[in-house]
Curated annotation (Swiss-Prot):
It comes from Thereuopoda longicornis (Long-legged centipede). Residues 1-17 form the signal peptide. Keywords: Disulfide bond, Secreted, Signal, Toxin. The keyword Disulfide bond applies. Expressed by the venom gland. Belongs to the scutigerotoxin-02 family. One of its GO terms (cellular component) is extracellular region. It comes from the Eukaryota. This is U-scutigerotoxin(02)-Tl1a. The keyword Iron does not apply. Its main location: secreted.
Amino acid sequence: MKYILLGLLLMVVLANANRLADPNCGVCTLRSICFMEKESCPKGFKCCAFKRQDKPGSKITRGCCVKNKN
């Protein structure tokens, strides 16, 4: 039961991440959640920050890994 609830929560988080992803970073593939203060994306990817529309002055700490545009 615990894993079902965690799966549902992850789906909600990923759906919101896609909606709030920064358009300047390209398409958010949502393969992994990254943290802005750590290098948590694989090589060839960068951490693209979520836009926080609910709290305009809030500090952005999370994002999603997107492929570098080269």
